[in-house]
Regions:
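Ferredoxin-type iron-sulfur electron-transfer modules and their immediate structural context
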Residues: 1-150
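Beta1-alpha1 glycine-rich phosphate/pyrophosphate-binding loop at the start
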Residues: 10-35, 64-76, 85-87, 114, ...
Length: 222
């Protein structure tokens, strides 16, 4: 790695995506506060990563995301590979990129945090998955072997959706039941739209259904 790459953080300050104008945020259902990175911005911010030998960001992450690895892929413009890597450890990375408390977890543990500003890990994670989905990327299940087993998951909140994702990847058919007509649980009904746009949840439903997950909504069990 060249000296310029190693010390890129000196020339590239921490920057978040642009905060959207108030008029745009309040139009309709209170849109998300921040816009999205464009590819050059995401690559620039991802390139600030020092690729630490002992990545504290990864250790501090509750699911131990391969953060330096997918930051490197973003810097190189390999977004679809980055999306696949994100999903190896996290069934809902686009949600975590928006609502996870990065300041107390991965970004708080970033080596650059105290003196130079942490790498914008959450915003880059959001960029990866949103961009990959927009480009038509979907989880590759071509090597999954059906087991013939079928599991019912009660509740279409974050835990239920994550469980369904992992079961399908293991070759197990899944039907998810929920008393409400929409999936998401707390993400749908507890987190306001200015933090998590509900269209993001709708996209995740489309992805899960494409993986073979069946939703039975408006059904109360027990």
């Amino acid at each position: 790695m060249s000296k310029k790459q190693v010390f890129q953080f000196l020339d590239a300050p921490r920057e978040m995506p642009r905060k959207l104008p108030l008029a745009l945020r309040t139009a309709g259902d209170w849109n998300e506060l921040y816009g999205a990175f464009a590819q050059p911005e995401a690559s620039h911010q991802a390139g600030r990563c020092l690729d630490c030998g002992n990545p504290y960001c990864e250790a501090k992450c509750p699911v131990h995301n391969y953060i330096p690895n997918w930051l490197q892929l973003v810097q190189e413009g390999r977004i679809l590979e980055a999306a696949a890597l994100c999903h190896e450890t996290n069934p809902l990375p686009e949600m975590c990129g928006r609502v996870c408390p990065q300041d107390r977890l991965c970004e708080g543990a970033c080596t650059l945090n105290d003196d130079f500003g942490a790498v914008t890990i959450g915003a880059v994670e959001k960029y990866i998955v949103d961009t990959a989905f927009a480009q038509g990327w979907r989880p590759d299940l071509s090597k999954v072997v059906a087991t013939g087993k079928h599991v019912a998951v009660i509740g279409a909140g974050p835990a239920g959706l994550a469980c369904a994702d992992r079961l399908v990847r293991s070759g197990i058919a899944v039907t998810v039941f929920d008393r409400y007509e929409q999936i998401g649980g707390l993400m749908q009904f507890g987190i306001p739209s200015f933090k998590l746009d509900k269209a993001v949840i709708a996209t995740r439903r489309e992805v899960l259904e494409g993986m073979g997950v069946v939703f039975k909504l408006g059904v109360e069990i027990g």
